[in-house]
Each structure stands twice: as structure tokens, then as C-alpha cells.
From Swiss-Prot:
<dbReference type="InterPro" id="IPR015807">
    <property type="entry name" value="His-tRNA-ligase"/>
</dbReference>
<comment type="similarity">
    <text>Belongs to the class-II aminoacyl-tRNA synthetase family.</text>
</comment>
<dbReference type="InterPro" id="IPR006195">
    <property type="entry name" value="aa-tRNA-synth_II"/>
</dbReference>
<dbReference type="GO" id="GO:0005737">
    <property type="term" value="C:cytoplasm"/>
</dbReference>
<keyword id="KW-0963">Cytoplasm</keyword>
<dbReference type="InterPro" id="IPR033656">
    <property type="entry name" value="HisRS_anticodon"/>
</dbReference>
<keyword id="KW-0030">Aminoacyl-tRNA synthetase</keyword>
<dbReference type="Pfam" id="PF13393">
    <property type="entry name" value="tRNA-synt_His"/>
</dbReference>
<dbReference type="InterPro" id="IPR004516">
    <property type="entry name" value="HisRS/HisZ"/>
</dbReference>
<dbReference type="GO" id="GO:0006427">
    <property type="term" value="P:histidyl-tRNA aminoacylation"/>
</dbReference>
<keyword id="KW-0547">Nucleotide-binding</keyword>
<keyword id="KW-0436">Ligase</keyword>
<dbReference type="GO" id="GO:0005524">
    <property type="term" value="F:ATP binding"/>
</dbReference>
<keyword id="KW-0067">ATP-binding</keyword>
<dbReference type="InterPro" id="IPR036621">
    <property type="entry name" value="Anticodon-bd_dom_sf"/>
</dbReference>
<keyword id="KW-0648">Protein biosynthesis</keyword>
<dbReference type="InterPro" id="IPR004154">
    <property type="entry name" value="Anticodon-bd"/>
</dbReference>
């Protein structure tokens, strides 16, 4: 009897399992600070659902079989498509925008190697029901703080630097349309996504099978755009003119600059992702000197949820996925003698009420200050800004949103409070409201903490 594990599958000894669960814990800490809610979905789904938006490459890797009842079923290859099905199934029971987090195993029948397995753990996070550059930037900031928490604050002696590459499929599709090859966009995107894996020469060879050389050269020149962020944007504007997707990327970068984390991001038009459901911003993250590929990837998907049911209107979403096992493999490359053990503290939830269009940037700066007020320890204040949309939301609806998420504290900042560098803090439990400075508000919120059970 052959008792070894299948190729691409592995056992985890106690030390390995400890590292994995601490990676999950660190990611959970960051996601919880943004008020993401934890969910779960089945490992098995109907094949028709998973294949609907998987794309040709993913379809080849799906574990598919007939169950004992003769049903055509498949093991999930990611957590995003099952999540879209989850939204379509449970939309009436959810409050939007919905912030989801989920960790679990996924399965892909691909060539296994270091950092790439057939069974592996992912930790996903999404914001659904919100289509704005703020939502895109919020997800990218989660990537940054998640990687910072893992590689700077997790293992004693590990100080891994990382870069987050991002792009926008709207920019590429606009360029393809200008070249008159819009109908070949999916074919081109799938090949562009392989440049860093197989090299530009092989990608060029594949593109030349269906596209003229002059056009292929134009495409490759665009995706290899060099320079600073400002120089790249200027070049794109000179090529595409007044373009909505270019403006979106500018706005996202401005938000990241607001948080002072923009230097860890790189506008890289080679990033296109290999899955058919992405429609907007896309990203991958790279840890220097690891040679492991992306450790956190994702993007915006505008049509995925509605594709599961004709009765569901368009629900836009944006999200990402941390590769837990790939991150563990990078940690294994290091020599370390001590794993920091963090105690997950009770969380105090805060919602910044969106009152004034002129104070949007300030609200997000304030949310970051709440989350990071005691950054040397595990985060213990969860905070989010209620998204401002075109129709506007009155205070009553924002309070109902807070109550539905069991958020205890509301923060109100209008022009008067902003000028005085104060805020109104309303405790929904005690039903009292105080005018406080930031430090005073921290004390009020922290003093009200109670022990809280967490999954870890």
C-alpha cells in the first residue's frame, strides 16, 4: 500500500500548522479592523456554477466528478465564484455594502511546485454593493496593512519588503478598442497575464498567431510603460485622452497617498489576471527576494453576481485573496527562532457617519488613525467610513446600517467639528453623545471594551 500523500497535497506538522494559523490570525486582525464580516461557503458546488465564469485556464484545473446521486459537482478552485453565488442566494438577508472575509481551502489540478499546490488555503476579503474608487483603494490598503502585519510585525527578525502591482482592465480595453481589436481583448489579456511567468518573447509569439506584428508591438509597448506614476498617467492621457479608467487609477493613487502608503504601489499594466470575471482594477503583490509569485491578488468584478440569476440587478464587487500557504513558504525561507504570539483583544466597532462631501478625505484619514492608534499591538478598534454614493444616504439609514452590524459607536464630523479638531461620538448602547478630541474619543471607546470571543 502506498501511504504517501498525493502530488500537490501535503501534511502539516504542529510547527507548520502554528505558523499557518498565526498568518490567518494576523490577516483576521487587519480585516477585523476594517469591520469585515466572516462567512463560509461549501467546498463542493454544482459544476455549472463554478464553470460559468472560471475561464478556460481555470476550467482545465477544476476537480470535477459525479457524486453518488449522479450530480455534476466540482471542488471550488477559488473563494470568489462561490462567494458570488452566496450573494445571489442570500442578497435579501444582507445589508449592503457588504464587507466579507472568508478563509478556507481551495483546489486546483495544476503543476505543483514550491509555493504552488493542488490544495491550499486562501483568506479572501471583498466589498460588495459599492462601485467607487474609495472601495478599490480600501481593498488595496487592506493588502498593504495585511502584508505589513505579516512580514514586519509577525515573525521575530523577518523584515520582508513587498510591492503591490496594480492596473485597470478598462485602460487596456480602451486601448484595444482604439486599435480596432476589441473582440480579441480576452485573448490578449490572458496572454499579457503570462509575461512574468513565461517571458515577453513567448507571449509575443502567441499574440502573433491572431494579431498583426505592428499591433502586437503597440500592445507590448503599452504594457511595458516605464517611469514614475505621474509620468505613466501623462503617457496614458496622451494615448487615450480623457479616459474614465485612467481617472479612476489617479483617484485610487490619491487615496493611497492620503494614507501615506503610495510608495508600496506600482502601476503595472502587465497585471491583467487570468480569470474572466474581472472588469476593473486588478492587482498582484510581490515579496522581494522570494521568487514565489503573488501572495495577494484580486480585483473588481462588476457582473459576476448578476450572472448567476436574471432576477438580480448588477451588484458590483471588489476584493482580494491572501495565499496563506505561499506566505508560509516565504516565511520558511527565513531563519527564525521565535514566533510572536498575539492575543486577540476585544474589538470596539466604530462607524464614521458620512455627513459632508467636502470632508471625504478627512473621514478616511480619521478611520486610519482609529485603526492604527496602537499599531505596535494587535489592532483592537474596528472602524469604517460609510460610503458616499450618488443618491446620498440620510443619517437614519446610516444608523440602521450600524445597528445591523452591531457597531456600537458612531462618529460625526461636520464643518464645525472639523474646524475645532473635534468629533461627536455617539454610544448606541448608552444612547449618549459627547463632543471629544481624537485622544478623548479613544479613551471613551477603549474604556467601554468587554471581552469578546473570536474564531481564534
Amino acid at each position: 500500500m502506498d501511504i504517501k500523500t498525493l502530488k500537490g497535497f501535503k501534511d502539516y506538522l504542529p510547527k507548520d500548522s502554528l505558523i499557518r494559523i498565526h498568518i490567518v490570525r494576523q490577516i483576521f486582525s487587519v480585516l477585523n479592523s476594517y469591520n469585515f464580516d466572516l462567512i463560509d461557503t461549501p467546498v463542493l458546488e454544482y459544476s455549472e456554477l463554478l464553470l460559468k465564469k472560471s475561464g478556460d485556464e481555470a476550467e482545465k484545473q477544476i476537480y470535477r466528478f459525479k457524486d453518488n446521486g449522479g450530480r455534476d459537482v466540482s471542488m471550488r478552485f477559488d473563494l470568489t465564484v462561490p462567494f458570488a453565488r452566496f450573494i445571489a442566494t442570500n442578497a435579501s438577508n444582507l445589508k449592503f455594502p457588504f464587507r466579507r472575509s472568508q478563509f478556507g481551502k481551495v483546489f486546483r489540478g495544476e503543476n505543483s511546485q514550491k509555493g504552488r499546490y493542488r490544495e491550499f488555503m486562501q483568506f479572501d476579503f471583498d466589498i460588495v454593493g459599492e462601485d467607487s474608487f474609495r472601495g478599490d483603494a480600501e481593498i488595496l490598503s487592506v493588502v498593504y496593512y495585511g502584508l505589513e502585519e505579516i512580514f514586519l510585525n509577525f515573525i521575530e527578525g523577518i523584515n520582508k519588503k513587498f510591492i503591490i502591482h496594480y492596473s485597470h482592465l478598462g485602460i487596456l480595453n480602451s486601448f484595444f478598442e482604439k486599435l480596432g481589436i476589441k473582440e480579441k481583448s480576452l485573448f490578449i489579456l490572458r496572454n499579457i497575464d503570462k509575461i512574468d511567468k513565461i517571458g515577453v518573447d513567448k507571449v509575443k509569439e502567441a499574440l502573433l498567431l491572431k494579431i498583426e506584428k505592428e499591433v502586437v508591438d503597440s500592445i507590448l509597448n503599452l504594457v511595458n510603460l516605464q517611469g514614475t506614476f505621474k509620468e505613466k498617467i501623462q503617457a496614458l492621457k496622451s494615448i487615450l485622452g480623457d479616459n474614465e479608467s485612467v481617472k479612476r487609477v489617479e483617484d485610487v493613487f490619491q487615496h493611497l497617498s492620503l494614507l501615506k502608503i503610495q510608495d508600496s504601489f506600482n502601476l503595472n499594466l502587465k497585471i491583467s489576471r487570468g480569470l474572466d470575471y474581472y472588469t476593473g482594477i486588478v492587482f498582484e503583490s510581490e515579496v522581494f527576494d522570494s521568487n514565489m509569485g503573488s501572495v495577494c491578488s484580486g480585483g473588481r468584478y462588476d457582473n459576476l453576481v448578476s450572472s448567476f440569476s436574471s432576477s438580480i440587478q448588477k451588484i458590483s464587487g471588489v476584493g482580494g485573496s491572501f495565499g496563506v500557504d505561499r506566505i508560509k513558504d516565504i516565511i520558511d525561507l527565513e531563519k527564525f527562532s521565535y514566533v510572536k504570539i498575539f492575543v486577540t483583544k476585544a474589538r470596539s466597532k466604530v462607524l464614521i457617519v458620512n455627513l459632508d462631501s467636502a470632508l471625504q478625505d478627512y473621514y478616511y484619514e480619521l478611520a486610519t488613525r482609529f485603526r492604527n492608534h496602537d499599531y505596535s499591538k494587535v489592532k483592537n478598534i474596528s472602524c469604517e467610513v460609510y460610503f458616499k454614493n450618488k443618491n446620498g444616504k440620510n443619517i437614519k439609514e446610516q444608523i440602521e446600517y450600524a445597528l445591523s452590524k452591531e457597531i456600537r459607536f458612531l462618529v460625526f464630523v461636520g464643518q464645525e467639528e472639523y474646524k475645532e479638531n473635534k468629533m461627536k461620538v455617539r454610544d448606541l448602547t448608552k444612547k449618549e453623545e459627547l463632543l471629544l478630541s481624537f485622544e478623548e474619543s479613544i479613551n471613551v471607546i477603549k474604556c467601554s471594551e468587554k471581552l469578546l470571543c473570536t474564531p481564534f
